[in-house]
Amino acid sequence: DNSYDSTKLKFFMSDEAGKWKEASLKKNWQIVRPCLTQGINIYGKCFMPSTVNEMTEGGEELKDVWNDSDIKNRDANGYTLSGLYRYFTPVYDGYEGFIDEYGNSVIETPEKPPKAIEGHLIEVGSKQYFENRRDSITDTAKLSEEKRQYPFSSEEAFRKEGNTSIF
């Protein structure tokens, strides 16, 4: 929790922030945040890439930071409540094996399969690939985990374990 409480930072990476169980992500961010600024000047950036554990296994802390990072909700000084901006990318955007030779994500199934950077033809789009995976899962708990680990939306990323309806 108490890391980086005095050193000025230009960059802070909190990898897999949605999986912290032993420490408080919110408390850690409260301590680290001032190290990225000096007065009103921002000198450093924070990056918190993560998939999300169950809410009771560290996910709730990241969800709180996510909710406090909404650019539509700012304080009187113009900052989000967390000082961060949230950013979400669906699993199917930029997924390995679905990038064409020009660096573009092949999300929708193409009429004419493009060549992937690895050399194979991309015959199905990445979104359809993940929809096919989901369609093959009949166990609701497994489907819930699949959606949380490979989310199409932030709502899926922060799914609670009780949200097990397959409809």
What is the meaning of each model-derived region?
Residues 42-51:
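Structural recognition of the conserved hydrophobic beta-strand(s) that form the central parallel beta-sheet
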Residues 23-42:
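Short, conserved "post-DEAD/DEAH" coupling segment immediately C-terminal to helicase motif II
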Residues 2, 19-20:
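Short strand->helix junction
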Residues 13-19:
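Walker B catalytic acidic pair
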Residues 1, 7-12, 25-26, 50-167:
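Conserved P-loop NTPase catalytic core
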Residues 16, 34-35, 90:
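Proline-rich low-complexity regions
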